[in-house]
Amino acid sequence: MAMENPFEGKEIWFGVGSQDLYGEEALRQVAQQSAEIVDSLNASGRIPVKLVLKPTLKSSDGVRRFMVDASADDSCIGVITWMHTFSPAKMWIRGLEALRKPLLQLNTQHHFEIPWETIDMDFMNLNQAAHGDREYGYIVTRLGIPRKIVVGHYTDPAVADKIGVWARACAGWQASNTMNVMRWGDNMRNVAVTEGDKTEAERVFGASINTWAVNELVAAYDAVKENQIKDLIEDYKAKYEIAPELLDKDYDSLFIAAREECAMVNMMRANGCTAGVDNFEDLGALPQLPGVGPQRFPSEYGWGFSAEGDWKTAVLVRIGAVMGYGLEGGASLMEDYSYNFTPGNEMIMGSHMLEVSPSVGTIAKPRLEIHPLGIGGKADPVRLVFTVAPKKDAVVVSLADVRTRFRMLMNVVDVVEPLGSLDKLPCARALWKPEPNLEISAECWLRAGGSHHTCMTTSVGREAWEDFARIAGVELAAIDAETTPREFERELEIEDVFHELANRH
């Protein structure tokens, strides 16, 4: 089992601006040098999606056709624009207003340094990105079109890295817009932050969130063939340490857990879903609250999963899994549980009763175990037990419905090793030190109304989520090393005013 490559068959279109004023020879050089730039970026190995150079854009009609075609082509997940020469910005208006794909403005040039001894007006006319990109940047800003801006010579690895992160965010955006979320049951009773406007979520994120009766999952459970279950158990044996009792007296429990995973996967695939949620209060005739199956959703299938009906976090986990494809680490549901206030070692323990995924990286091989669970009213569930491996500059991301809009909240964190063995804790767990410190992080998180459920990503960090939020047009409040409570509170107040004005009709 392996996650499908979300970048395969996808493209980012590269549009270069100029105008007919410069003549045939200059435009020939523009096309040639543009091809060299795109070839170099593609060869860098830092951008997971192929860049495709399109014919030089020299007129309003040409720009509009380029943008309309990009918007209509499902293989195109984003557009990069660069002005090799001066390109009058009025000719970009109709095209930019027709664009429905993420946009990146690249501010680069073909030459690395000014040719001090030979530069003449022919060179100046041909190489004036510093001129043309300012004209173009003005019109994009005037039109209010969100875009990422990357500045630097195209041979600089940092430039390719920034484009690569943005390309991952573009893939996350496409995954969001094609996402079907399967809810087995509804929200956990009386819980507030996991609720949300599913209709508005489809408008904003493109994700379709719907409910399937738990009885349908029970029927799928009954229909699973024995050979599928046994094949899955062999996969467990290959990837995890297994507690001896699960291969002996408790083998039936392992068989049931594998059967539940098969049923969930079969239903998800049959309905084209890439994220799912369940609720321990609504299990019908299922023998166990699903544990190992949901834990494997991100790591084995690239799907999102969250518990207790929390579809918003499931959406984030799917987006995080797509953005981080091919990188070390991954994405998982996480939940803030307990603080460590020891001076110098202030940290947060995150966990969940069953569903944290090993996709985020583990210190040792995950171990399949069986333990009692005091909620759900079902048989003892089988789950993977592990500790998340240390990782600097990871992030935890929350999505909350704050009445008038969705707010994404992100904290940059360093995942660290625990200070003890945690031998008696029968669930997956992570320890992290939040930036700038525990006190300020927690105060700001509470101030912003952040959820106790988050998506932890150890593959992509802050920049990818910032790019995603910009593409989605969603507020992102970030807590990092520079955050102070006073400034953070002011930023939230400014966001409130901004969105209040923006939502007036």
Curated annotation (Swiss-Prot):
Alphabetized SUPFAM superfamilies for the sequence: FucI/AraA C-terminal domain-like, FucI/AraA N-terminal and middle domains
Cofactor: how and how many bound: Binds 1 Mn(2+) ion per subunit.
Cellular component per GO, a single term: cytosol
Top-level EC class: isomerase
Pathway in which this enzyme or protein is active: Carbohydrate degradation; L-arabinose degradation via L-ribulose; D-xylulose 5-phosphate from L-arabinose (bacterial route): step 1/3
Keyword annotations of the record: Arabinose catabolism, Carbohydrate metabolism, Isomerase, Manganese, Metal-binding
Catalytic reaction(s) noted: beta-L-arabinopyranose = L-ribulose
First and last residue of the signal peptide: none
GO biological process, one term: L-arabinose catabolic process to xylulose 5-phosphate
Coiled coil: none
Pfam families documented for this protein: AraA_central, AraA_N, Arabinose_Iso_C
Cofactor(s) of this protein: Mn(2+)
UniProt GO MF annotations: L-arabinose isomerase activity; manganese ion binding
Entry annotated with the keyword Isomerase: yes
Enzyme Commission no: 5.3.1.4
Residues at which Mn(2+) binds: 308, 335, 352, 453
Function, as annotated: Catalyzes the conversion of L-arabinose to L-ribulose.
Cross-referenced NCBIfam families: PRK02929.1 (NF002795)
Annotated family: Belongs to the arabinose isomerase family.
The protein's name: L-arabinose isomerase
Species of provenance: Bifidobacterium animalis subsp. lactis (strain AD011)
